[in-house]
Amino acid sequence: SNILIISGHPDLTTSNANKAILDAVRARFGDNVKIRELDKLRVNGKFDVPAEQKALVEADVIVLQFPVMWYSISSLLKQWIDDVFEYGFAYGENGTALQGKKLLISATAGAIEDVYRTMLPRDVSATLTEFENTAAFTGMPLEEPLYSYGTTGDPDNPAVARAIGEDHGK
């Protein structure tokens, strides 16, 4: 399978867990995975839409990897979806380019899982249900999502967040 990971972290240089996930995936899958780091691909506020669409067409599996930010996806990933999933490409008349490609959501949450279970009315999976509609609308089977919690970690000990990310990436 050709795996495409769309990294929606707004600044990977500040992330321990998300960077570790990408490193672990690269180590495991080698040349079978392509990673698009959106924080490096947006130039002057815009994406190269034809290049992004080409990467999607070449993939069998599309992984959206991102940190949960205020119980949603990053604005960077949202812009990418808005720009790239165009009418006639992802949906609508002749919009069949994504049909049959597997979609996997891979998200990290800074808070520990207990916070979502005891202090908030919904857990992370409930806040990301928009992907069920996106997958259905574009004809992509939605795979079981992967979530990692507690990825903010201890600022004095970034190894904890990296370890969580490495485990998530396996």
Question: What name fits each language-model region?
Answer:
Residues 31-39, 141-147:
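Short beta-strand elements in bilobed, periplasmic/extracellular small-molecule ligand-binding domains
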Residues 33-55:
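N-terminal beta-loop-helix "entrance" segment that forms/cooperates
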Residues 51-132:
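Helix-loop-strand module that forms the ligand-binding subsite of alpha/beta enzymes
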Residues 42, 114-121, 156-160:
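Surface-exposed cleft-lining segments at the edges of enzyme active sites
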Residues 10-13, 40-43, 121, 151-153:
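Short histidine/acidic/glycine/proline-rich micro-motifs that form metal-
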Residues 16-20, 47, 75-79:
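Generic recognition of short, well-ordered alpha-helical segments
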Residues 1-31, 36:
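N-terminal beta1-alpha1 ligand-phosphate binding loop
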Residues 22-26, 130-170:
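Glycine-rich phosphate/pyrophosphate-binding loop and the adjoining helix
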